[in-house]
Amino acid sequence: MRAFAQVDVFTDQAYLGNPLAVVLDGRGLSDEQMQRFAQWTHLSETTFLLPPTAPGADYQVRIFTPGGELPFAGHPTLGSCHAWLQAGGRPADATFVTQQCAVGLVRIRREGARLAFAAPPCQREPIEPTLLASIAQALGLMPSQVRASQRMNNGPVWHGLLLESAETVLGLQPDHARLRALGTKVGVAAICTGQPMLIARANREARASRTQSPPELPQPDLEVRGFAAPIGVEEDPVTGSLNASLAQWLMAEGLMPERYLASQGVCLGRAGQVHLSRDAQGHTLFPYTTLFRSRKSVV
């Protein structure tokens, strides 16, 4: 029997972020056992903590979705770090925790109760036109509703679409079977400005109130949704790797400022908030998070 923790990431309010299961000691588990447990938790990601093998790392993590293993993901990075610290982990550096994963070493900054990570480099390229048309069709979009697009790779590969308005983002009803057949994970976003934002705000509150009273939240600068049917997650509540990739793309193009707030999860009754910024060197992003709850059971 071994302990695991469940934490809620990208929120400071109960049950409104993105939950993560963290097996605190993954030693001795086979790949098959890890995958089977990740399917059992039925969360978007489950992680397994291991002793580090790379010099300079405080611990090692392996990240599984119901459909397979990931080289890197944002909310598992932050949630795993939180669980490791809560379980008594002691980093070599008082202000940074260094995590080892399949993409290498990721430094996680400690700022009081918050954690932040420096996003891995993101490789970007245009989406092939035929594939872009197929993605838009699967999302129910007209070509004119897509302002810009980019294939983004910071470990996970996301096909990012910048849409005309937050209302369009919140109103999407994707054909997940078609996205699964395309084999593409898709992130959609829209800048929250002007009249479209006023409409979207009403939509946000109406959607959130389906499950509980809407929380008082700061208004976001970017509305985000992430669809990942190929890995068994039709819609992810809040996605660190996607938000990091979007930030690197949109900041580089001058479409977003060097510090902004993204919202994700509204259509699932969540209230995820991701704070993104670029450091003084102009190349490192820190998505901030607050983790609300932690509970342990056995596996």
Could you tell me what each predicted segment is?
Residues 1-72, 78-295, 299:
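Active-site proximal loop and beta-alpha junction motif in alpha/beta enzyme cores
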